[in-house]
Amino acid sequence: MSRVLVTGAYGFLGRYVVRELLAYGYEVVAFGRKRDKLEALRADGAEAAELFVGDFCRQEDITAATKGVDFVIHAGALSTVWGKRSDFMETNVRGTQRVVRACKQNKVKRLVFVSSPSIYAGKCDRLNIREEDYDASNRLNYYIESKILAEKVLREQRSVPCVILRPRGLFGIGDSSIIPRLIKANRRSGIPLFRGGHNLVDITCVENAALALRLAVESEAAVGQVYNITNGEPQEFRAILEELFRALGETPRYLRLPLGLLYGVATLSERVYRLFRLDGEPPFTRYTICMLGYSQTLNIEKAERELGYRPIVSLRTGIRKYAKGER
């Protein structure tokens, strides 16, 4: 069976990808910087994984790790809405360049890259977005810029066959980002709600994203292609919140806020934090306001047609599984 290296293996998505590949008989090399977290991954359903401690931003590490590997899934990244541009460029752009060099040197058959539909984000509603429907000059935040540039690196090189996936809004057991933030906000002052929460949200159970990545490894038709990945079940933001907190046995509390005003506040906050080099993250960022206030749905027909992608965990099931794990 083929041998697959997964970068970012102990991250939220990476853990599910490792287990998905092992379940289908692949030999898996779990790559990450911290041995204790890799050991914890192996103890949590990935006993058969080989561990490789390293940093893909170090050329010697990723080159050594890719020896004897057939496929690489590059899921490692600096994924946050705020930070220094230099950090995003080093990790997400130059780090990807080093992964490509390693794959070329070791004759890896295919590199599957985890990008982000954050590149579609903006100050407007966007529905049924196709893979080509993005602005390459989008600079809403440094993360978006870095993912656009990383994709450019992959498109412009010709030495390694590549596939790019853009999974949207991952959630599930082990999530430390989207749902935990909503729960935390609800238990404090309330969840920010813009436009009555009627904006459409298109999110993805993490198990479905892991499935899509395995399919990208297996499908010859995928080489050179880009795919949107979601659950294919767009829902109003407020409806998702109601479902989530009903499953948790809690009552959602909302902070109804004016969208335009908060976008202006976020813009000013970002400038102040940059100018004075303040620690931490602004209370609101333009990206966060766009994600909470505007509709964004993705067209996944290409993934369905070419990868044979069919979500295996429904939105409702995913929410209930998460809630059960939280209780």
Language model features by range: what are they?
Residues E50-T91, A102, G122:
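NAD(P)H-binding glycine-rich loop region in Rossmannoid oxidoreductase-like domains
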Residues L215-P282, I300, R316, R320-A323:
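Mid/C-terminal beta-alpha module of Rossmann-like enzyme folds, strongest
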Residues R98-Y142:
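Conserved Rossmann-fold NAD(P)-dependent oxidoreductase catalytic core, especially the SDR/UDP-sugar
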Residues G172, F194-N199, Y227-P234, F245-L248, ...:
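Glycine-rich Rossmann NAD(P)(H)-binding loop
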Residues C57, D87-R98, E145-S146, T204:
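Glycine-rich NAD(P)-binding loop of the Rossmann-fold in SDR/ketoreductase-type enzymes
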Residues V4-Y24:
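N-terminal Rossmann NAD(P)H-binding glycine-rich loop of SDR-like oxidoreductase domains
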Residues D125-F171, I191:
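Catalytic helix-loop patch of NAD(P)-dependent Rossmann-fold dehydrogenases
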Residues L149-A150, S176-R181, R195-V217, G224-N228:
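Substrate-positioning beta->alpha
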